[in-house]
Amino acid sequence: MSNKAVIIDGVRSPIGTKGSPMIGMRSDEIAGQVIKGLLERNEKLDVNLIEDVSLGCAFPEGPTGMLVARGASILAGIPETAAANVINRYCGSAMTSLHMISSAIEAGDIEVGIAGGVEDMFTIPQGGFAPDFNVKLAEQDYYISMGEGAELLADELNISREEQEEFSFSSHEKAVAAREAGKFDNEIVPITLEDGTIIDQDSGPRNPDKEKIKSLNPAFRADGTVTAATSSPFSIGASAMLITSENFANKHGLKIRAFIEGRAVAGVNWKMFGSGPVPATKKALEKTGLSIDDIDALELN
């Protein structure tokens, strides 16, 4: 009998950016449609056996407030017997939901759960609806912006504007090529708007123009290196993964997509938050007895 946590399936909505028809749609509705889509493509799972639903959210306010994971679960048709929670670790929130559900499975607390995330950067203002800063923390630059943090990291590691722009250009090229080749189709749950419009493609990736990228002004410092072309866009969307124990999957005829071999978290100086994945990755590799050379694909949230 194995309590090892396994991934059965994972899906997401299209990611909406500026100009997307998804803007204005309630994020709990988006998350509900995503979870419902996940369940519909895993018909062998009895939804009455789902024990917990965990969604990560950086700003659980407004439509993403009021325990959005519970609301999304109800909209998806999950029975009221399933619990729900919302986790905030900013950009790592959804990943932390995966940590929580898989840890609960391995501890024997539950056998099946859903982990994911939801965010609406258009309805929720930067900093939230009512930011309230602690002066003692403000004096230590605790509330540093993502843009300024990126500038500090670029300074520390001598990452030039040219290197950032080349990476951004390559990233958009790859994303557009993958989208056109249908590489994302299997992971996207089409979202239906109130007027019946169906959205099934990301709006963020675009055919990049090197000259336009070079012409942009720095976004966060007058003499900075980070521009709109090398920054993350405002986004709206949701994701969900079906996680079970290995024993549960085998017992119920669920195809295992991946085994969760290990987890780790690590802290760094808050002004250098962008470097956090480095010590966390080192810890995860050490705990699992792997080296970076054993890894074929890396993804950072």
Locations of regions flagged by a protein language model:
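Conserved active-site "lid/cap" helical segment
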Residues: M1-A58, G62-A72, A76, A83, ...
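N-terminal extracellular/periplasmic Venus flytrap/periplasmic-binding protein-like
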Residues: R12-S13, G24-Q33, K44, E163-K251, ...
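Cysteine-centered functional microenvironments
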Residues: G16, S54-G56, A82-T96, L153-R161, ...
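Conserved catalytic cysteine-centered active-site region
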Residues: M25, C57-I110, D141-E148, N207-P233
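Active-site-proximal alpha-helical scaffold in enzymes
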Residues: S73, I87-V118, A154-F184, A240-N247
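Flexible glycine-/small-residue-enriched beta->alpha junction loops
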Residues: E106-L157
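Conserved N-terminal phosphate-binding loop of PLP-dependent enzymes in the Aspartate aminotransferase
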Residues: E119, P125-G128, G147-L152, L254, ...
